[in-house]
Amino acid sequence: MSTINTDANEAMPHISVNAQYIKDLSLENPDAPSSLAALEHRPQIDLSLDINITNLSEENFYEVELNIEAVARNEKYKLFQVELKYAGVFNLINIAPEQHQILLSVHCPAMIFPFARKIIASCTQDAGFQPLMIDPIDFGALYHKKMSEHQN
């Protein structure tokens, strides 16, 4: 029989995911059914991503929100536009405050992104298109780019 030392485990730095949820979801399919018949070529996809971090009232609890917008077009039609706000509530336990920003900007978004990606893929497929499979995102590179822009 093994004994688990809960005191040692509680002192270890870690991130706890308390909740994940859709805050807002919108899909527009403005030219259906004409646009569905016009899918001869792969559409152009314009993708934007933003991350919002909110310090909740409780100590070390944060909401990290991914705002993703994808617009697909071809020569004739705006095929679809999908907007998703997907968030998670994270508790940063035994983590130094100077590490919070990078964890909330890189690790937490990376933890919830696969769920947001799946929602977008399902929505676009349900709209009659091929599922939009967003490529993995390097949140670390985005964070470092944003930090270097703020320094300049």
UniProtKB/Swiss-Prot annotation:
One of its GO terms (biological process) is protein transport. It is found in: Cytoplasm. It holds the Pfam family SecB. CDD domains: Translocase_SecB. Its main location: cytoplasm. One of its GO terms (cellular component) is cytoplasm. It comes from the Bacteria. Keywords: Chaperone, Cytoplasm, Protein transport, Translocation, Transport. One of its GO terms (molecular function) is unfolded protein binding. SUPFAM superfamilies: SecB-like (SSF54611). InterPro entries: SecB, SecB-like_sf. Homotetramer, a dimer of dimers. One homotetramer interacts with 1 SecA dimer. NCBIfam families: PRK05751.1-3, secB. One of the proteins required for the normal export of preproteins out of the cell cytoplasm. It is a molecular chaperone that binds to a subset of precursor proteins, maintaining them in a translocation-competent state. It also specifically binds to its receptor SecA. Belongs to the SecB family. This is Protein-export protein SecB.
